[in-house]
Structure formats: structure tokens, C-alpha cells
């Protein structure tokens, strides 16, 4: 599962932090977290990524291990169990760069918490804070102004007729974690819709 050829010369090391960060992801966010720990504590974080990226692949401040299909639940759990076994009994902190990884951590919190410190809220609260349709009600309760929002299910085209909005619209997936796994031509994080035809498309 792990591609040892992608490891830099030195292994991960907790340094003065007293805890080893295990970071999931291969983007600038993963590098930034590793750099912050390195600058503050001399830590060499362990970064698990699905591929070797130029941002983390050759960095001397972290150890990068490639785990193919890391975002797949069984692979995710097996990889983290192997890391925990390898580093036991050292304290580990699990950090994620990607909503889908945060959600996987939250869904398996009880299992992972036996080996990792998890700095994320429980799943129920995570859903309230990150699901856009539920977050809207929280804003209303707190009196926080936000753009007028309505939830539309593409599987129910007739539902659009009752929405209290008019074009042009900005559309986003209600769950960015779930949307990560969706694959279709023209996929974007945000859609700008000038009319109904753009929505149907």
C-alpha cells in the first residue's frame, strides 16, 4: 500500500512538540501544516497522500508516503492503523487537508481516537456546521446575515418551481465532502447560472 520510494531520507519525528502530526493530503495545505509544526517545534510530520506532488514530494521538513486510493474508506482505515502500529506508543495527531478526509475521520472517530488525537468536532456537529442547508438555519438562529439560499435536488426538477429565488444564481453542492467523490464532465466547485437552461445543463 505504501510506496517507500517516496520517502525523504529522514523519518518523521515529533521533535519538541511531543506529538507526531499525521497529515492527510498532498496540497499546499498539507505542506503549510507541516511547515508550521517544523518551524515551531522542529517536527518532521508524516504526510500521507494519494500521489507524490511537487509541494511535498521532496521536502526535507516532512516524510511523505504515497497511499493509493487513500480517500477510499477501507484503504484509509488500514493505512492509519498501520501508521499507529508503526509509531506506537508515540502520541499521534491526525490532521486533514480536504473535507472528505475530515468527514472520514469524524465517521470513524471512536476507532481512530484509540491511537490519534483528533482535533475535530463530532460528526453530528460537523454536519450542522458544514452542510450548507443546515448551516443556514444556524445563521438564522444566531442572527448572522447570509445570502438568500434555497436547497434544490436535481433529481426533482419540479422542486425548482417553488424556490423563492430568481436568476442569476450561484449554485454549490450542499456537502463538499460528498461532492468530492462525484465525477461528471464540467464539474466545478461553484456554478454561475444565468437562467434555467444553465441549471438544466
Specify the residue positions occupied by each region the protein language model found.
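Active-site nucleotide/adenylate-binding loops and adjacent lid/helix of ATP-dependent enzymes
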Residues: 128-201
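ATP-binding N-terminal substructure of ATP-dependent carboxylate-amine bond-forming enzymes
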Residues: 1-124, 141, 155-159
Amino acid at each position: 500500500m505504501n510506496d517507500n520510494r517516496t520517502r525523504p531520507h529522514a523519518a518523521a519525528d515529533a521533535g519538541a512538540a511531543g506529538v507526531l502530526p499525521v497529515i492527510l493530503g498532498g496540497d499546499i495545505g498539507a505542506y503549510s501544516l507541516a511547515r508550521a509544526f517544523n518551524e515551531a517545534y522542529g517536527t518532521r510530520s508524516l504526510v500521507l497522500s494519494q500521489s507524490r506532488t511537487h509541494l511535498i514530494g521532496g521536502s526535507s521538513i516532512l516524510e511523505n508516503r504515497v497511499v493509493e486510493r487513500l480517500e477510499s474508506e477501507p484503504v484509509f482505515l488500514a493505512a492509519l492503523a498501520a501508521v499507529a502500529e508503526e509509531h506506537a506508543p508515540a502520541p499521534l495527531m491526525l490532521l486533514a487537508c480536504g473535507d472528505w478526509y475530515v468527514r472520514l475521520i469524524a465517521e470513524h472517530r471512536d476507532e481512530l481516537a484509540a491511537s490519534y488525537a483528533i482535533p475535530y468536532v463530532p460528526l453530528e456537529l460537523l454536519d450542522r456546521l458544514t452542510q450548507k442547508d443546515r448551516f443556514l438555519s444556524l445563521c438564522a438562529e444566531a442572527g448572522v446575515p447570509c445570502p438568500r439560499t434555497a436547497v434544490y435536488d436535481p433529481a426533482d426538477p419540479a422542486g425548482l418551481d417553488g424556490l423563492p429565488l430568481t436568476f442569476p444564481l450561484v449554485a454549490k453542492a450542499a456537502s463538499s465532502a460528498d461532492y468530492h467523490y462525484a465525477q461528471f464532465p464540467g464539474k466545478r466547485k461553484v456554478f454561475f447560472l444565468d437562467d434555467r437552461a444553465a441549471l438544466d445543463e
